[in-house]
Every structure is written in structure tokens, then in C-alpha cells.
Amino acid sequence: MFGISFSELLLVGLVALLVLGPERLPGAARTAGLWIGRLKRSFNAIKQEVEREIGADEIRRQLHNEHILSMEDEARKMFAPNQPSENSPEPANPPPAPAAAEAASPVHNQAAHHEIGPAQPAAPKTELSLEKTAKPADAGTPVPAPPAHDSSLPPRAP
């Protein structure tokens, strides 16, 4: 606090021991400690009172808030050209809603519409080749969406 090193403090202690003697030195050290504590407390109280009077806390808060607001404005200016406006029109191609509705329908309701009858024989196995089934699509023509439910398959259990 005062820039006193250990050697200087030791020198002051030795001089006090020689001047006061071993009987009065502990009482003098205790009294000096109490006075130093009182001085510190009174100095801190005066410092807080002065800060309260001049409104240093309010000034600090105001400066801090102004700094934050200026940073927000700079950030808005930086990001404003990159972000689309909130009043922009909807995209021209909305996602297909009917396909999503068909896919979301429960499977057990479809099973209720099918009649349960005698077992039918399985269809004969046929060989498939990729050459016959896969044809490349043109880039300009849209590809039709696959059906949501293949009616040739038996219903799934819930």
C-alpha cells in the first residue's frame, strides 16, 4: 500500500523495540493497528460519500449504456444490407403440401378400409434389370413425386 518493503518494515520494528522496550511494544503495535484500521475505514467512507455526491456510478452506467447502444447500431448497420427485409414477399414456389398430408396420414386408418379376405397366392417372381427400369430424366422436366402409399403392399401393423 505504501511501498514499504520487508527490510524497511523490519528496520522500523527494531527501532520501535529499542525505543519502547519489550514490555510496551505489543500494546503499541495493537494501538497502531487499530488506528490504521480506523483510518482505512474513514478514508473508504469519505471516498464512497464523494462518489455518491457526484454521481459517479450513474455516469459510469450512462457511459456504459451509450457504448453498448453504439455497438448495437454498428452491428445493425453491418448486418442490415445482408438480411432480407421482413416485408419481403413469400417465395414463388411453396413446398408441396398435399404430399406431406398424405404421408402424415396414419397407416392403421388405411388398414381399416381394406377387407380381409382369403389369402391370395403370391405373384410370380420376375427378373428386373436396371436397363429397362431406369431412364435418365431431362434436367428441364420435373420428376413426378412417388406415391405416398403403394396399394399393392399389405398394410403395416400399428
From Swiss-Prot:
An MF annotation (GO) of this entry: protein transmembrane transporter activity
Coiled coil, from the record: none
Chain spans, region Disordered: 73-158
InterPro entries for the chain: TatA/B/E, TatB
GO cellular component terms listed in the entry, alphabetical order: TAT protein transport complex
Record localization: Cell inner membrane
Membrane-spanning residues: 1-21
Any one biological process term the GO annotation gives: protein transport by the Tat complex
Keywords, ordered alphabetically: Cell inner membrane, Cell membrane, Membrane, Protein transport, Translocation, Transmembrane, Transmembrane helix, Transport
Statement: the UniProt record of this protein carries the keyword Cell division: no
Topology in membrane: Single-pass membrane protein
Compositionally biased intervals (Low complexity): 80-90
Keyword RNA-binding (UniProt): no
Family listed: Belongs to the TatB family.
Known partners and oligomeric status: The Tat system comprises two distinct complexes: a TatABC complex, containing multiple copies of TatA, TatB and TatC subunits, and a separate TatA complex, containing only TatA subunits. Substrates initially bind to the TatABC complex, which probably triggers association of the separate TatA complex to form the active translocon.
Free-text function comment from the UniProt entry: Part of the twin-arginine translocation (Tat) system that transports large folded proteins containing a characteristic twin-arginine motif in their signal peptide across membranes. Together with TatC, TatB is part of a receptor directly interacting with Tat signal peptides. TatB may form an oligomeric binding site that transiently accommodates folded Tat precursor proteins before their translocation.
Name of the protein described by the UniProt record: Sec-independent protein translocase protein TatB
Provenance organism: Pseudomonas syringae pv. syringae (strain B728a)
